[in-house]
Amino acid sequence: MLVLGIESSCDETGVAVYDSESGLLSHALHSQIATHRVHGGVVPELASRDHVNYLVPLVDEVLTKAQIRKNQLDGIAYTAGPGLIGALLVGSCFAKSLAYALNIPALAIHHLEAHLLAAKMETPSLDFPFIALLVSGGHCQLIEVNNIGEYRLLGDTLDDAVGEAFDKTAKLMGIPYPGGAVLANLADQCLSTPYQFPRPMTDRPGLDFSFSGLKTHALNTWNQSEKKESDRSEIAKAFQQAVVETLIIKCKRAIKESQSKRLVVAGGVGANKALRSALQKWIKDIKGEVYFPALEYCTDNGAMVAYAGCLRMMRGESDGGWGVMVKPRWPLA
């Protein structure tokens, strides 16, 4: 089965072709960072317009790379939510229209489900059940994954998502958008820090997260410093250490409470070097398994949507109609 995947939930336009027999045939991505940098963050209207401009060229590109024609496609999967409503509508309208023209099924895909399954796309031997740590700019959740479509929410953020906390903390210290990755890089390059930040919500039971207080702690520390570049790096180091250790503590609890020692890390923050290293060390100590998508599949992309769509379409699923329906807010579990 050949499935075209379309991702347009926020500020990246992703398109891919996945084959149920041969795997990922091609994928392409357009990032809108340059468009939004001058505004200091994502502007929804501009994001939607950019998707309109790039969807058709990207579809042509992936079909050419895969050496297939449109009429060879068996289905089209598209992100229907959660995300920015305008951006979602662009992708869904395009997908449904193309599917209608080709007389093939279209299927709405949950953005977070696509992230959860991205590691399985590269490692088909990854079996259910597993615990997933979903860490991105919009989400920070621990999820028990028992099968495709069978999810149980174990813990969620009460305020900022972890990627959001990185970006906001960076902005508070004068690092331009998108600052989260720059902040992490400063932390990685800093050998040591005199600062010790709190590990929020680790002194009580449960698997929920909270990062807004950590962000405030970083701001206060920055304002009390001489605001030199070395101060920025040391605060970044302390902030990242606190975030990573907090995530590790919560993952330890989730694994201990579950019947599985398999952990999957999903979402853009899954590319963080310090987090990857710490999780690999811990999981090795408990003789467990940890799975990360390749860096290019951590952030939003069309490949994960095409893969999730292929899995569901092979079970006979489709939208069953041509009406367009997106869900900007769409709980996974």
Curated annotation (Swiss-Prot):
**Protein localization:** Cytoplasm
Q: Does the keyword tRNA processing apply?
A: yes
Per the UniProt entry, the signal peptide is none
Chief location: cytoplasm
What GO terms are given for molecular function?
iron ion binding; N(6)-L-threonylcarbamoyladenine synthase activity
Cite the entry's keywords alphabetically. Answer: Acyltransferase, Cytoplasm, Iron, Metal-binding, Transferase, tRNA processing
Annotated GO CC locations: cytoplasm
State the free-text cofactor note. Binds 1 Fe(2+) ion per subunit.
UniProt-annotated binding residues for substrate: 134-138, 167, 180, 272
Q: Could you say which residues bind Fe cation here?
A: 111, 115, 300
Cofactor dependence is on: Fe(2+)
Q: What is its EC number?
A: 2.3.1.234
Set out the biological process GO terms recorded for this chain's protein. Answer: tRNA threonylcarbamoyladenosine modification
Q: Which reaction does it catalyse?
A: L-threonylcarbamoyladenylate + adenosine(37) in tRNA = N(6)-L-threonylcarbamoyladenosine(37) in tRNA + AMP + H(+)
The domain of life for this entry's organism is: Bacteria
Enzyme class per UniProt: transferase
| Gene3D superfamilies, A to Z | 3.30.420.40
Q: Which family does it belong to?
A: Belongs to the KAE1 / TsaD family.
Function, as annotated: Required for the formation of a threonylcarbamoyl group on adenosine at position 37 (t(6)A37) in tRNAs that read codons beginning with adenine. Is involved in the transfer of the threonylcarbamoyl moiety of threonylcarbamoyl-AMP (TC-AMP) to the N6 group of A37, together with TsaE and TsaB. TsaD likely plays a direct catalytic role in this reaction.
Matches recorded under NCBIfam families: gcp_kae1, T6A_TsaD_YgjD
What is the name listed in the Swiss-Prot or TrEMBL entry for this protein? Answer: tRNA N6-adenosine threonylcarbamoyltransferase
What organism is listed for this UniProt entry? Legionella pneumophila (strain Paris)
